């Protein structure tokens, strides 16, 4: 069936900010979908609030709205753009929920817009657990025993029948938000309350426990002619009970019998037909009881998902692109497979390799959170590895994780035998992020495959391979010396995924010596293609992975090449922003005539799409893996400054091994990162930094802190995302920090800085070329005061309170620093301003996480310009010598995962905790801030009671805010100290007890829904601890809270702006003065 002619203009909804459960994979799928629609001549309008995405670049969609993903904003866009269709399947749960709301409120009908990709009926049937259950019963597909509840009482009566443990799954939520596993009545009540609150329809499913069953997923694609294909089967190594996003997964499924696979396949076809997904991809999850083979369906997603991104990367089959074209009316047999160019898209991919995905967690950022993995997703990123066998792919995946582990090393265990056994058995029984290493340790301690299976419920097939790897490591150790190791033994170890570093650890040699020995014996990897067809047809896209076999499938070309090192797994502190920079580098260098070679191991990203670069190596970002690629490809050089800390960490050894590093030299990077060299640099240029010192032992730390005076900021050297960074208020806190957070040593010193009270922090990004010319990209003023990590702080561009003179002085200082360091490419400087004094906090001669934001706001593609400077172009040649000028305001706001981690304090500090960001664009600061809050999911109130409690220093500043709130009709609720102060200024307010003063107190009022906004500032360890429950309950009850006066001031301005005017929506292209397709007309 050829393409429909009635689809000419489509609104695509993106997924908004990166959150746990909905991450970078939707930038990948959205970018693919937009390209596919444009290729077909369709006009594309995009709504997405996330500026760090490639899809929101102004050249992708015809009209790009970086606006809150809300019904109000979407309706205004529909009214002005008048698209004929809406594609909701590329933006995760956020897009589906918005499309559902627009349809049910009659807004789509009002503007004559149809849903494509998935009908409202299909969305409801798949997402509403009650309708899904009825649909499954109709076609005779079994589900776990379950029932629905819209109240706690209904849930309690259901569990009487279902029994414990019980699984709670809220409807229409993301990544299992609000759900969990309850083992008793108390846990059940707590999880049900949070599930009912999390579900937009206030419905939960209470389900019998299928804990310990095997879990599988099928990626299914269907077209309007009812052709259905299975793109990929995925098996979870972790059994049921762990969210699939938190499980180690393997593709294709390894332990299904052919009969079981056919049953599952037939069920999938019946399900996708009954639900009614006609055009596009769905992900269907199944559980199988290993004891009797009983199969049940768990759930389905009627959209592109995290798993479909993984399946696309695992198979080379671009699900999102195909789904977008199917939504236009094509059938599978009419579409070509890009990789082979010969086969139609209706051919199911065949794999002659194994893919392993391992999730990446960030529990170290939330030390008080429970690390147990359940049905509510907690991982922030993932890695994927490809090998010819499961052991090879598994070992490659584990070393891709960047956890400091290079293989199956022993985890820490108590020395005492009984205690050791108890800890080990618990680590096998309870799923936590470190379980893979405990499984290996169990075999070292003499446990059998049956013992480990009984405790962990991991399938014996996987356990036997892990046991084999442990035995192999032990027998390698017995050789004792490299020259005693037979070539065939070394070759087999490499074929099983043992890295040079792991072999070196086992034999007592540095990795370089193992590598030299291996090369001398001519043991090197070959590279195979991911080709969708197990090498049956020729593949045209070089999408490659390494393995230790004979035949090489993709010899390098003789073109000039640049190697780009990606950023590995997403984690807090190293997010999508760095992938964005790598993608831009690939685009720019390809346009400049270079062959681009990308190395990365993250399946969620645009950088690992098969057509982003000329050659893609899906490999771990380790010295060994990168050197093997570079020695084969022989690039003119490598770009390491775009992928965050991951490539920077390995840049010096790569340079030593003969790989030229493009742009800023590794030595200059070290001058900026090494505290003592940095202090000398600041002194040489006559600049200032906060008083500081370096401690190489506990005793030194106390001396330095005493000299500087408390409070101080403490942190380890060479970190990203403020890892283990803390504000310390007294000797006792420093003692605890030194004991628990870091181990200070000559190699790993601890940095101690004076804490700058009441200072304003500023980020500045620039590009420099080889001649010393500099272009300032933008200056961002933080809304929170100094002391909050720059990745967490809200910020405005241009600055909102700094004098032009101060801004010019900062620019001059940044240019002097760039020239002194010899920066070629990007550089970021963080300043703190106290009064009229400018302090330099840090200099990062690399891409920073603010680059995409500044590039979006100004229309200047900084990463592209920087990449071209790194291969020798000058800013003058590129025609960008002036700082970009613009008349609008952009506000960056961060998004946090606190709701997923019970008991974690939401107060911000020097350690980064946000997972993503949003942007507010408007012509004034108040409206831009209001948009940023709405985009971040903050519900700004129109009326009601505002709670104010501030530290003494902030009392004068809060008077004006209190007056403005009163004049808007809000009433004030305050603590006694603030009440006394406001009374002297003639401001009326009601007094409420502090948490420490008895009940009913402020927390009771928040829980009872009486408070609509919280302004609560604190300083000092005790005050912060005392007010913890105010912040936590505000978060859990969706009450906006502001913990600094600056943020409260912006919020009050935003409330005034919302009172006076409707927020307008405007495409990015209009803000930037870029010509886009004319709006409003259907052509």
From Swiss-Prot:
Entry keyword set: Amino-acid biosynthesis, Arginine biosynthesis, ATP-binding, Ligase, Magnesium, Manganese, Metal-binding, Nucleotide-binding, Pyrimidine biosynthesis, Repeat
Pathway the protein contributes to: Amino-acid biosynthesis; L-arginine biosynthesis; carbamoyl phosphate from bicarbonate: step 1/1; Pyrimidine metabolism; UMP biosynthesis via de novo pathway; (S)-dihydroorotate from bicarbonate: step 1/3
Entry binding sites for Mn(2+) 3: 830, 842
Residues annotated as domain ATP-grasp: 133-328, 679-871
Chain residue ranges for the region called Carbamoyl phosphate synthetic domain: 555-937
Enzymatic reactions: hydrogencarbonate + L-glutamine + 2 ATP + H2O = carbamoyl phosphate + L-glutamate + 2 ADP + phosphate + 2 H(+)
Binding site for Mg(2+) 4: 842, 844
Domain of life, source organism: Bacteria
Binding residues for Mn(2+) 2: 299, 301
GO BP term (any one): L-arginine biosynthetic process
Molecular function per GO: ATP binding; carbamoyl-phosphate synthase (ammonia) activity; carbamoyl-phosphate synthase (glutamine-hydrolyzing) activity; metal ion binding
Cofactor binding, per record: Binds 4 Mg(2+) or Mn(2+) ions per subunit.
Residue ranges, annotated region (Oligomerization domain): 403-554
Binding, ATP 1: 129, 169, 175-176, 208, 210, 215, 241-243, 285, 299
Pfam families: CPSase_L_D2 (PF02786), CPSase_L_D3 (PF02787), MGS (PF02142)
Region (Carboxyphosphate synthetic domain): 1-402
Annotated residues for binding of ATP 2: 715, 754, 756, 761, 787-790, 830, 842
GO cellular component: cytoplasm
Chain positions recorded as Mg(2+) 1 binding sites: 285, 299
Region (Allosteric domain): 938-1083
UniProt binding sites for Mg(2+) 3: 830, 842
Binding site for Mg(2+) 2: 299, 301
HAMAP family associated with the record: CPSase_L_chain_A (MF_01210_A), CPSase_L_chain_B (MF_01210_B)
NCBIfam families hit by this protein: CPSaseII_lrg, PRK05294.1, PRK12815.1
Identification of the protein by name: Carbamoyl phosphate synthase large chain
Origin species: Myxococcus xanthus (strain DK1622)
Source taxonomy: Bacteria, Pseudomonadati, Myxococcota, Myxococcia, Myxococcales
